[in-house]
């Protein structure tokens, strides 16, 4: 599991934890828990939702770790918009791919703030950012955990000061699978599905040595500029 600190955002959401699991055996049970938790009420419902308070992403549709990180950063930037004047030009992709947001002009991070989202919460907003279209139902179906998911990326929008060990233990209590390093993400990429979703078939016709890298760049760029255009 990797952890990233984004101090410019409200402390309740400023620590991001991402983990990659392969050979996941309980995807249907994860989906069932998510659905049941969303329908429960009272203290029991609060506890059930806290136990599955993660973003679950179909890892076979991720082309790199940067793909996920850019979607996470874009989600936070949309949820907690800047209060300063808008920049004349959008930041270069290289700045987003290696995000340093400490200098961004954001609303006060000392206040408890609720994120602004177009969907139900930050987790579904993340799935929407990963999708090339704005159909929330479609983005959840494609990019969220499904009954046949075996490679799963798990995201925690955590609080400043959260113990990394406790976050990981909470993930393991939900996901039955093998934790692997993010350097292995590209091994599981389902390029046939990625090509269809992001409409990359024209790049396949190039048949150049760096075709895969060009497609990877195209996917990341699509996610990076989604909230700009």
UniProtKB/Swiss-Prot annotation:
Q: InterPro entries under this entry?
A: CGI121/TPRKB, CGI121/TPRKB_sf
Q: What is its main location?
A: nucleus
Q: Which UniProt keywords apply?
A: Activator, Chromosome, Nucleus, Telomere, Transcription, Transcription regulation, tRNA processing
Protein's cellular compartments: Nucleus; Chromosome, Telomere
Q: Name one GO cellular component term.
A: EKC/KEOPS complex
Region annotation (Disordered) ranges: 87-120
Biological process per Gene Ontology, one example term: tRNA threonylcarbamoyladenosine modification
Q: What is the protein's quaternary organization?
A: Component of the EKC/KEOPS complex composed of at least BUD32, CGI121, GON7, KAE1 and PCC1; the whole complex dimerizes.
- Indicate the family of this protein: Belongs to the CGI121/TPRKB family.
Checking PANTHER family in the record gives:
CGI-121 FAMILY MEMBER, EKC_KEOPS COMPLEX SUBUNIT TPRKB
Q: What does this protein do?
A: Component of the EKC/KEOPS complex that is required for the formation of a threonylcarbamoyl group on adenosine at position 37 (t(6)A37) in tRNAs that read codons beginning with adenine. The complex is probably involved in the transfer of the threonylcarbamoyl moiety of threonylcarbamoyl-AMP (TC-AMP) to the N6 group of A37. CGI121 acts as an allosteric effector that regulates the t(6)A activity of the complex. The EKC/KEOPS complex also promotes both telomere uncapping and telomere elongation. The complex is required for efficient recruitment of transcriptional coactivators.
UniProt-recorded name of the protein: EKC/KEOPS complex subunit CGI121
* Gene source species: Cryptococcus neoformans var. neoformans serotype D (strain JEC21 / ATCC MYA-565)
């Amino acid at each position: 599991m990797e952890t990233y600190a984004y101090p410019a955002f409200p402390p309740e959401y400023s620590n991001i934890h991402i983990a990659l699991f392969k050979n996941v055996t309980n995807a249907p049970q994860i989906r069932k828990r998510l659905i049941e938790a969303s329908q429960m009420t009272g203290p029991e419902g609060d506890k059930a939702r806290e136990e599955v308070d993660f973003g679950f992403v179909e890892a076979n549709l991720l082309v790199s770790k940067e793909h996920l990180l850019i979607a996470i950063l874009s989600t936070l930037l949309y949820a907690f918009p800047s209060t300063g004047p808008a920049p004349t030009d959008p930041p270069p992709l290289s700045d987003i791919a290696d995000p340093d947001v400490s200098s961004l002009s954001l609303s006060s991070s000392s206040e408890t703030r609720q994120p602004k989202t177009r969907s139900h919460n930050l987790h579904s907003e993340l799935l929407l950012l990963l999708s090339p279209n704005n159909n929330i139902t479609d983005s959840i179906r494609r990019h969220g955990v499904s009954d046949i998911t075996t490679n799963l990326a798990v995201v925690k929008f955590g609080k400043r000061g959260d113990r990394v060990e406790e976050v990981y233990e909470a993930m393991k209590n939900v996901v039955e699978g093998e934790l692997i390093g993010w350097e292995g993400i590209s091994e599981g990429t389902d390029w046939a599905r990625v090509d269809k979703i992001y409409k990359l078939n024209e790049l396949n016709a190039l048949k150049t040595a760096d075709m895969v890298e060009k497609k990877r760049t195209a996917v990341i760029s699509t996610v990076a500029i989604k909230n700009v255009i």
